[in-house]
Amino acid sequence: MIHGTKVLKEGFAKMTKGGVIMDVVNAEQAAIAEDAGAVSVMALERVPSDIRKAGGVARMADPSKVIEIMDAVDIPVMAKVRIGHFVEAQVLQSLGVDMIDESEVLTQADEDFHIDKEQFTIPFVCGARDLGEALRRVDEGAAMIRTKGEAGTGNVVEAVRHMRTIQGAIREIENKTEEELWQVAREINAPRELVKLTAEKGRIPVVNFSAGGIATPADAALMMQLGADGVFVGSGIFKSENPELVAKAVVEATAHYEDADLIADVSTDLGAAMPGIDINEIPEEERLQNRGNLI
């Protein structure tokens, strides 16, 4: 197998910085996302809110669905695989997608291992709730991290929690000695070289987007102000009353996240946002964010 270089994979991820990646389930939605200014689309059969409602086992999208969406747009297309399901990843690579999301939104396939992402030519994005989780995924070859949030809820609280957790951990290690960093590496179960690099850079070594519960332009701007390099929006666009308007507004708010006047303007008369779920109504064992966090 010919391996894509680490530089090329991370370079692709950096090209999406400052942008919005939108979940789409068909060619029509993909075209709406592209017209709104999305930097990429995520091809899947059901958005996270529908996956949550349906229950059962959620798997990689049918290849015909992925191809339909790839043929509909000129922007990069991503697709999800189950955690640890390297054959689903092989299939998506064969189809020619631009990036693979090893995602907790789908049912976990392997409770002991994530995919060895260095065995693939295309880049991967993975979710994380804390610094240790993020750096373990980077060590496996992830070219992008996204804070997990709680997908399919329309509730940004967990996305905020995870971004603050990661950013806070980075601030704590920035001025530590090398010996102290080794201790941190042991405590968070992460490679010490990556812990040291994170302390030196003042950020995790790859692009870090936010995901899970972003439903409004203000949500997107909030995550950017908290330190995200960009945002994933799953159910928030196409479960809203006016997807075309919301998609454009989220893109504008993400690009101009410090301009309150602009955010107010694009947030006006959008219609109803997607229905939300109080995180306290979701039992701990049913929270998607918990999938893969112990690996």
UniProtKB/Swiss-Prot annotation:
One annotated GO molecular function: pyridoxal 5'-phosphate synthase (glutamine hydrolysing) activity
EC category: lyase
TM region(s), chain numbering: none
Signal peptide: none
Active-site residues, as the UniProt record annotates them: 80 (schiff-base intermediate with d-ribose 5-phosphate)
UniProt entry keywords in alphabetical sequence: Lyase, Pyridoxal phosphate, Schiff base
Binding site for D-glyceraldehyde 3-phosphate: 164
Enzyme Commission number(s) from the entry: 4.3.3.6
Family of this protein: Belongs to the PdxS/SNZ family.
Quaternary structure note: In the presence of PdxT, forms a dodecamer of heterodimers.
HAMAP family linked: PdxS
Protein name: Pyridoxal 5'-phosphate synthase subunit PdxS
Organism: Methanosphaera stadtmanae (strain ATCC 43021 / DSM 3091 / JCM 11832 / MCB-3)
Lineage of origin: Archaea, Methanobacteriati, Methanobacteriota, Methanomada group, Methanobacteria
Gene from which this protein is expressed: pdxS
